[in-house]
Amino acid sequence: MNNIELLDCTIRDGGYVNNWKFTDEQMKKCYNACSIAGLDYMEFGFRNIKKKESIDKYGPSYFSDEEYINNIVGNQESTCKIAVMVTINDFDINDFVPKNQSKISLVRVLMAYHGGKNKDDLVLDIKQLSDGIVQMNQLIELGYDVAFNIGRIDKVSFEQISEVAKLLSQTKIKYFVMADTYGSVDNDYIEKLIPFVKREFSNSQIKIGFHAHDNCTNATTKALHALKYGADIVDGCVLGFGRGSGNAKTELLMMDLNKNYNKNYNFINIIEFGDEYLINYKECTNNLCYNVVYALAAYVGCHVTYAIDIIEIYDKMKVSDIYNIFMELKRLNKHMFHYSSLFKELYVKLKHN
């Protein structure tokens, strides 16, 4: 179970929110947070063809060229590998240098509509897929690991999945990733889908992945359920920050994987990045809005009133300080009930350090 991997796609998926106009500082902070956290991959963005109309409209992580990535990463050494995404048959293989000249490890090739240009769910566009495999093989020859990401997985029949598996099993791609594009996949379907896909790819070394959307506020649960039923890698975004309803929350995935899969992710830096650059916990003051302070309280096992006080009464605190106070309450065995005077004492002590 310790072979499970986690990919953070905050920048690539969250780019739909701001047209990929992240500052260099945000990018560097995100990569640093992912590195310290021990994440397996950070997806820097798309690698799209540079067209004038696109350059005018979108920020640099829409293109994620070599110069841009090199500028963000610099000489930083990290076990967190870099990924980019391309759209099947809609990218230029010449935009990729050999892997030994690039900081990119993984290229994810997206086929959003299995029916091709007609977008007909009853049809599997074999030509689109076959042409895409040619380019995937070219990427592999350049030295990259390759993931094939298929969208709208609930619209792809099991028979079509079998056809896709037969073609992809003949390649050396590393991952087959399914996207819950409309957020409509539920856990019952996951229990059927993941084992079926595992069987279809059983004669290959290809790992299975799942990308969940949060339309029904259950993306994190679905991602974890996919892991329970055999997925090898799942995607997440910091605080769920992504297109539309968002995605599975990277920090919650990390917490669960630490508890149940013997992982040792450092999620504090991830949360601090989100708190500083996406939305801080003081802006989420009612229970209709996800607030990560409650997640931290749950992870440690602290009484909810401590979290409420932090959000509603006390001045803004660093996420690491919140976590340390929770851990100190637990050490003192005062975490399960609300001791307001003790909490105030710990808070004042923290402020004066």
Q: What are the residue ranges of the model-derived segments?
A:
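Catalytic cores and adjacent flexible loops of soluble metabolic enzymes
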Residues: 1-353
